[in-house]
A protein has these predicted regions:
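Single conserved hydrophobic/aromatic residue that forms the stacking wall/gate
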Residues: 1-13
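Accessory, usually C-terminal, subdomains that scaffold auxiliary metal cofactors
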Residues: 7, 31, 39, 100, ...
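Small-residue (GG/TT-enriched) beta-loop-alpha framework at ligand/catalytic clefts
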Residues: 8, 27-126
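A charged helix-plus-loop insertion that forms the helical arch/lid used to bind
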Residues: 10, 14-25
Length: 183
């Protein structure tokens, strides 16, 4: 893209971001995955610090990593990936290879994760009996949620991750990054 067009696009994304969240222009970071943009902030001033301290370092949002690495997994039905972290669950929703949504929601109880899953299915008019749900993350929560969802969704299973991740308890994002670096 021409530098002027790129700058205009970045400003539009920053304006949209600031319509929901408050952040200084220089703190809003952007990742691009297959024509989609992920806008995010971390800590005020962090982006400038990282650019000064680690010039050329690639900084990515964990949601961007999930979208990029999971979009090519072929399933004949809509699919939802849920990565359960302490206090947060990441949801990535696809219809075929088309990304519908990538979002993180806070949770305190398993019912919160179920609520967010079924809310996403409702928003995108996806029949629970016609969806594939893949779970990863915290072992106990993942196993309990898998049992709870068995009667409600067509397919529910653990997300297949590289062997080292399952043996070491490595996060899904870290294991997907390792896999991509080896490829």
């Amino acid at each position: 893209l021409h530098p002027r067009v790129r700058r205009q696009r970045q400003m539009c994304i920053r304006d949209r971001y600031n319509a929901v969240y408050e952040a200084a222009e220089e703190d809003i970071m952007q990742d691009y995955v297959d024509g989609k943009v992920c806008a995010y902030t971390l800590v005020p001033g962090l982006q400038a610090f990282l650019q000064r301290t680690f010039p050329g370092a690639r900084i990515r949002c964990h949601q961007s990593v999930l979208v990029k690495r999971l979009c090519d997994r072929v399933v004949d039905m809509p699919r939802v990936y849920i990565d359960i972290r302490k206090g947060w669950a990441d949801f990535v929703v696809f219809d075929g290879t088309k990304l519908l949504m990538a979002v993180s929601h806070e949770w305190r109880a398993q019912e919160d994760i179920r609520y967010h899953l079924f809310n996403l299915l409702d928003v995108y008019d996806i029949d629970p009996k016609g969806v594939h749900v893949s779970l990863s993350g915290m072992r106990d929560e993942k196993n309990a949620l898998m049992q709870a969802l068995r009667g409600d969704v067509a397919y529910v299973m653990k997300t297949l991750v590289p062997g080292i991740a399952s043996k070491t308890g490595m996060s899904l994002v870290a294991s997907l990054l390792m896999r991509s670096e080896k490829a």
